[in-house]
Amino acid sequence: MRSRVIFCCIVALVISLFSVNLAAQVIPKSIQEGASDADLRERKNAWTVGIVGGLLSGTYMRFVDEMASALNDGDNLRILPVVSYGAASNLDDLLYLRGIDAAVTQSDVFEYFRTQRKTPNLDRRIQYITRLPIAELHILARNEVQSLEDLRGKKVNFGPAGTGASLTGTIVFQRLGINVDQVLIDQPTALQKLQSGQVDAIARVIPKPIDFFSKIPPNSGLHLVNIPFTKAFEDFYTLGEFTKQEYPNLLPGQDRIDTIAVQAVLAVFNWQKNSARYSKVERFIQYLFNRWDTFQHPPYHPKWRDVNLAATVPGWTRFSVAEEMLQQIQVQQQPQKQQQRADFDTFLSNQPRMPANDAEREDLYRKFLQWQAQRH
């Protein structure tokens, strides 16, 4: 009898614990709620914005993925990150692929489409939301390659057609008058071929630092090649650099080397006002600007802190909603401007000389923000 009582108590305890566990494991409300297929289809698509980023391992794709993490708001807004080949294919997708509303691309890609491909009405069809961090041209080669000239007639991989490097890298060699044997394969495979001697260099345009390069072990026999900035690159490119701290295993015997960099841009299709697609983009931009502070802290990419929302892109038109949001922010920040102006004057007084071009001004602005953050 006693054993039966104990058994019943144990069974009751197990049932009780199981019931509590079930109560704790609540199915999310968004999954529980049912509706007709038509209603669900409408709800899922009403505020979904497609943004094409780039290669899955690239920084551009991480930017888009982080926008989704920071801005997604159930059925009110959903960012759909789309993987692609890179900056050049992104602009193609923004122009022609169904479901794409925005894309990360580059200023030189836009100019190439406008002047060389002569894409009809590009200036009116594609506008921008904000500038993104610059992307540096990385050229990785075996140690015997000491300059770009050493790659004349050699095999250089630019990544699959459509990547930023397949356009920017090709333009760089063309402008320098260096003919190379162009290879267009994925970069992980190209790295293996570089190590085995089947290709002589790989080119990749991506914001630094990137694990693809920084994780190359020491004594690999590979290094990043110095790219001197000349007048040939003054139109759409700026001076960049790589340091020993960023790539400790790829700058043997050097603390830093030069490279060229190109401006990345968050581009948007200029949908007709009052259309459904325009409303989607409008809501996305409102969320982006209103939650901008979210991107300034970990775990978000540190390059977000380099972005100046007010910075312009020469030759491009800012999307009207972005311009309106920017003006609202500037009005809200008006009380801070006098103090910031005084801070900037103090900062400038400690500089050896005034900036000579846009690249120097942007660099000075970043340093000013860092200096200001330390003071306040």
Each PLM stretch: what is its role?
Residues 30-34, 127-146:
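Hydrophobic/proline-rich hinge and linker segments of small-molecule sensing/allosteric domains
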Residues 65-69, 80-121, 191-193, 210-216:
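Pocket-flanking alpha-helical
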Residues 107-108, 117, 178-276:
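Pocket-lining segment of extracytoplasmic ligand-binding domains
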Residues 189, 195, 206-220, 224, ...:
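An extracytoplasmic/periplasmic, membrane-proximal ligand-sensing/linker region
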Residues 77-86, 179-187:
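Short beta-strand-to-loop elements that line the ligand-binding cleft
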Residues 48-71, 135-192, 196:
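Bilobed "Venus flytrap"/periplasmic-binding protein-like clamshell domains
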Residues 8-18:
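Bacterial N-terminal signal peptides
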Residues 26, 161-172, 240-314:
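Ligand-binding clefts/hinges and TM-proximal coupling segments of bilobed small-molecule sensing domains
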